[in-house]
């Protein structure tokens, strides 16, 4: 968990921008052929890898990662990538931020930690969604177009 710093008054909060629904939560043992089926239905989603027993997210996986895994599989799976599960090839560098943080704080998290995915939590610490790159970038562009939001 990353602490968020001081907030610019009037700057949009993360929960106020984007949809936070461009993801699917999947189990650790999801086989890659089933990953392919999920991406066939919703190619723009990120798959968030979750362990129900631990109540913990362990990683993320994008369509781009899927292509990399099949095109250049890890040594262990060189001749049998179709038998691998998502946990074998997922990105483990994920970060969490409160959805009451502002856009600048989210951007600070991106530039310092470079996570593969940013998970959102609500005021009670529960999972509240996912902040997509597109939503963050759109919000940053809006701030650039209207700098008065930062000091409002």
What are these regions (language model features)?
Residues 25-44, 50-51, 95-115, 120-123, ...:
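The conserved cystathionine-beta-synthase
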């Amino acid at each position: 968990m990353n602490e968020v710093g001081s907030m610019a008054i009037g700057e949009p909060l993360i929960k106020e921008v984007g949809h936070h629904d461009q993801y699917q939560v999947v189990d650790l043992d999801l086989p890659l052929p089933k990953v392919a089926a999920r991406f066939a239905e919703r190619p723009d989603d990120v798959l968030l890898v979750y362990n129900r027993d631990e109540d913990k997210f362990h990683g993320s996986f994008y369509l781009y990662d899927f292509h990399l895994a099949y095109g250049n599989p890890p040594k262990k799976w060189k001749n049998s990538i179709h038998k691998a599960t998502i946990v074998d090839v997922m990105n483990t560098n994920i970060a969490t931020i409160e959805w009451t943080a502002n856009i600048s704080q989210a951007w600070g998290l991106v530039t310092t930690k470079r996570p593969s995915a940013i998970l959102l939590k609500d005021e009670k610490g529960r999972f509240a969604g996912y902040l997509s790159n597109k939503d963050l970038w759109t919000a940053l562009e809006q701030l650039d177009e209207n700098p008065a939001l930062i000091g409002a």
